[in-house]
Every structure is written in structure tokens, then in C-alpha cells.
């Protein structure tokens, strides 16, 4: 039987349908309020508003749960590879062996970008941020696929594969251009993560051998960042896509949103904070500064809009960080890791942070891993974009397959 919530406005009662969720909180359907009650709902930042129905990702922030298509994120990070998770997000189920092989072959086949795109990079000054370069390059793919202004359902999967395949190539090209090195072409004998590391660190005169521990760590990082419900960048992609815009242009809007320091740039801020603290002996001083409302200092890497418990992604990354530093001989002498571990231990015992449910989030350890890998801080958000492109394309595809889809138009 249908359930309803009652809304009383100026003495008149309106019955609002309660939509049952397959898991998690139920939802009150307010779509008819403006037409029937002659008023709108007001919810800055969409704190309590669902903008769509989705079966891709589920989060229970109070319990620290993150699932993709029903699979726990920790299981996926430990037992899957990134393209297997990409297939899961896009198609709704894990691939068979044959499906996985076909999918990875298609991704490899589309990893090259048009040679004319190389000229675009030459228009940027040498000091340009890699995110600025990547944003422009991804948006320019719209010019190479102009027919996608009139895309059909048959185009959804190929478009997703093309975007997933080309984003690491463009990301590596953005980095190479920013440091004045020649572009390295994809090597389809390597898997997705190996190929990206190869394009990042190889040169025409120096062969780069991928360390398997580094590869596995980056694979986990990509999986952990693949999707996260209707966050700022995902919502941006959906809003742009709702107008029927070219999908490559839609992804470029997601990259722009992700670039913001409150979204994708937080792990770089964590590194800067740990450097500012400088030594474990100064942690109490900075804890006090974080509690002081009049002090501009903020404890980065703690707290999350959704999670009111330990971010499950942070738990995986903490152990991954230790594995990487042990492999590189830095486990016992990496000052940033030592500060991070002690800062976390002190904060988790402090009533101020406990009462406010401020726990380490996914950004707290990822920057330390990137830095140990030799990835510069200006590339941190670029790597986030590589991973999140999978989620963006899955959400974009789901949106266009939704019969209730309308152009987004907030009031």
C-alpha cells in the first residue's frame, strides 16, 4: 500500500507520496508541490534533496558503508581491478571472463587520441596547471565526435568506453606538457593502470618498469574514487547531460567542478597541512588551532558531508599507504606518514572531534601515497578525474536511460 506524508500550507493539507528505497532512507516526492501548493521547497546545497533515482552507488554515512551495485567497496578494492569495477558501474553487474576480456580490449583499442589534439597542448604556457590542460582537452573531444549531439541509446556504451580509454592518455599528456617532456603513446600490451604509469614516467630514451606494488596501490586508489553518489562533480555532469549536450563536454564540466579545493583538491591540501605542522611535537598546537573558531586553520582530511563515521575508503588507503612506503623503504622514515598517524590517533580520542563525528576521509592518506609514488601535487586531482570518469559515465548513461529524465532546472 502507498504511504503518504502530509504537508500543511495555509490551512490546506497536501498528501505527498513516500517512495520506498530498496536500501536506506525512504524519500518524500515533492515534485508536485510547486504546481499544487503555489510555493517551492528551499534546500541550499541539496542537503536533503534527491535529484534522481539511481542504482549505482549506496552510502550509509552513519555506519561508514559504501557499496557499488550492492558490492562493498572494501571487497572491490581488495579483489577486483579498476576496469572490472568500471564494467560493474556501467553495466550493473560484474563481468564474466569473456565479457571482461572484450571490455578491456575495447578500452585498449580506444586509448589513442587524434593526432590533431596534440596541437591544442601547444597553446598553453609552460606553467599551466595540468587540470586546466586536461579540462580543455577533454572538452575539445566534442569537436572530434560532433555526431554525439544527436546520440542514440546504441551510442551510450561506446561513448563510455571511449571516455574511460582516453582520459588517462589525456591526463598523462597534460602532465608531460607541463614539465616539457614529449608525449608517450599508450602501450596496449599493458593493463589500464600500468599503461597510465608508463605514459606518466617513461621517456623516449628511458624505459619505465612498473613496480607491481605501486600498480596495485594505484589500482585501489582508482577503485576507491570511481563513484560516490550525487556529489558536486557528478551532479554537474548530470545537469549538463540533461540538456542533451555532447557527452565529452559534459565530462569536462565534471572536471571543472572536481578541480575545486572543497571537492577534488582536498588531498593536496592535506599534504600542505602536514608540511605546515612539520613535526609530531606540534600536533597539539594545531589541534588547538583547529578548535579555535577565530583561527583560520582547518584540519584537512577530517570530516565528510556524508560520512559521520570512519570513511571506509580511508581505512583501505591507510593500509595501502603503509604497503607502498614499506616497498619504497620509507615506512619508518617518512615524516608525513608519522605526523598523519599520530594526528589521527590524537584526533580520534579527542571529545571535540568525537562529538562532531570528524573522522579521517579518503583524502587523508591518498596524497601521501601519490607523493611517495613520485606523482607531483598538481597531478593529484588529475588522477582523481581519471577514476571518477567511470562514475560520471555510468551516471550519465543511467540518466539517459531513465524514462523520468527531464532537463535540470533548479528554482
From Swiss-Prot:
The UniProt entry annotates the active site at 304, 363
Q: Which UniProt keywords apply?
A: Transferase, Tricarboxylic acid cycle
Q: Where does it sit, as one GO cellular component term?
A: cytoplasm
Q: Which reaction does it catalyse?
A: oxaloacetate + acetyl-CoA + H2O = citrate + CoA + H(+)
Supply the InterPro entries for this chain.
Citrate_synth-like_lrg_a-sub, Citrate_synth-like_sm_a-sub, Citrate_synthase, Citrate_synthase_AS, Citrate_synthase_bac-typ, Citrate_synthase_sf, Citrate_synthase_typ-I
One GO term in the molecular function aspect is: citrate (Si)-synthase activity
Any idea of its EC number?
2.3.3.16
PROSITE patterns associated with the record: CITRATE_SYNTHASE (PS00480)
Q: What CDD domains would the database entry show? A: EcCS_like (cd06114)
**Pathway stated in the Swiss-Prot or TrEMBL entry:** Carbohydrate metabolism; tricarboxylic acid cycle; isocitrate from oxaloacetate: step 1/2
Which Gene3D superfamilies does UniProt cross-reference here?
2.20.28.60, Citrate Synthase, domain 1, Cytochrome P450-Terp, domain 2
The extra comment attached to this record reads:
Citrate synthase is found in nearly all cells capable of oxidative metabolism.
Stated family: Belongs to the citrate synthase family.
Q: What is this protein called?
A: Citrate synthase
Which organism was this protein described from?
Rickettsia parkeri
Q: Which gene encodes it?
A: gltA
Amino acid at each position: 500500500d502507498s504511504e503518504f506524508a502530509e504537508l500543511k500550507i495555509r490551512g490546506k493539507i497536501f498528501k505527498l507520496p513516500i517512495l520506498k528505497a530498496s536500501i536506506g532512507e525512504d524519500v518524500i516526492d515533492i515534485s508536485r508541490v510547486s504546481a499544487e501548493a503555489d510555493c517551492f521547497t528551499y534546500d541550499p546545497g541539496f542537503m536533503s534533496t534527491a535529484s534522481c533515482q539511481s542504482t549505482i552507488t549506496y552510502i550509509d554515512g552513519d555506519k561508514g558503508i559504501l557499496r557499488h551495485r550492492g558490492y562493498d567497496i572494501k571487497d572491490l578494492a581488495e579483489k577486483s581491478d579498476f576496469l572490472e569495477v568500471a564494467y560493474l558501474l556501467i553495466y550493473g553487474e560484474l563481468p564474466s571472463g569473456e565479457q571482461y576480456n572484450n571490455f578491456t580490449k575495447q578500452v585498449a583499442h580506444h586509448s589513442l587520441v587524434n593526432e590533431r589534439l596534440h596541437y591544442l597542448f601547444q597553446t598553453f604556457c609552460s606553467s599551466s596547471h595540468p587540470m586546466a590542460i586536461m579540462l580543455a582537452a577533454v572538452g575539445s573531444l566534442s569537436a572530434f565526435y560532433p555526431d554525439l549531439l544527436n546520440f542514440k541509446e546504441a551510442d551510450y556504451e561506446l561513448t563510455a568506453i571511449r571516455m574511460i580509454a582516453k582520459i588517462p592518455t589525456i591526463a598523462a599528456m597534460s602532465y608531460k606538457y607541463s614539465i616539457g617532456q614529449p608525449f608517450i603513446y599508450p602501450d596496449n600490451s599493458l593493463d589500464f593502470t600500468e599503461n597510465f604509469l608508463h605514459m606518466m614516467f617513461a621517456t623516449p630514451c628511458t624505459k619505465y618498469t612498473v613496480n607491481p606494488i605501486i600498480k596495485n596501490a594505484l589500482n585501489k586508489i582508482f577503485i576507491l574514487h570511481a563513484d560516490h553518489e550525487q556529489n558536486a562533480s557528478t551532479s554537474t555532469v548530470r545537469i549538463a547531460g540533461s540538456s542533451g549536450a555532447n557527452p565529452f563536454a559534459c565530462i569536462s564540466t565534471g572536471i571543472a567542478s572536481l578541480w575545486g579545493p572543497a571537492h577534488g583538491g582536498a588531498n593536496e591540501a592535506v599534504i600542505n597541512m602536514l608540511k605546515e605542522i612539520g613535526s609530531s611535537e606540534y600536533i597539539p598546537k594545531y589541534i588547538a588551532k583547529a578548535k579555535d573558531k577565530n583561527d583560520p586553520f582547518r584540519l584537512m582530511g577530517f570530516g565528510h558531508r556524508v560520512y559521520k563515521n570512519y570513511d571506509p575508503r580511508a581505512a583501505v588507503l591507510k593500509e595501502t599507504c603503509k604497503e607502498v612506503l614499506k616497498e619504497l623503504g620509507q615506512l619508518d622514515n617518512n615524516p608525513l606518514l608519522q605526523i598523519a598517524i599520530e594526528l589521527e590517533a590524537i584526533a580520534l580520542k579527542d571529545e571535540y572531534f568525537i562529538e562532531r563525528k570528524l573522522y579521517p576521509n579518503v583524502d587523508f592518506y591518498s596524497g601521501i601515497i601519490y607523493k611517495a609514488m613520485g606523482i607531483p601535487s598538481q597531478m593529484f586531482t588529475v588522477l582523481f578525474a581519471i577514476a571518477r570518469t567511470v562514475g560520471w559515465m555510468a551516471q550519465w548513461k543511467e540518466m539517459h536511460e531513465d524514462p523520468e529524465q527531464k532537463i535540470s532546472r533548479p528554482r
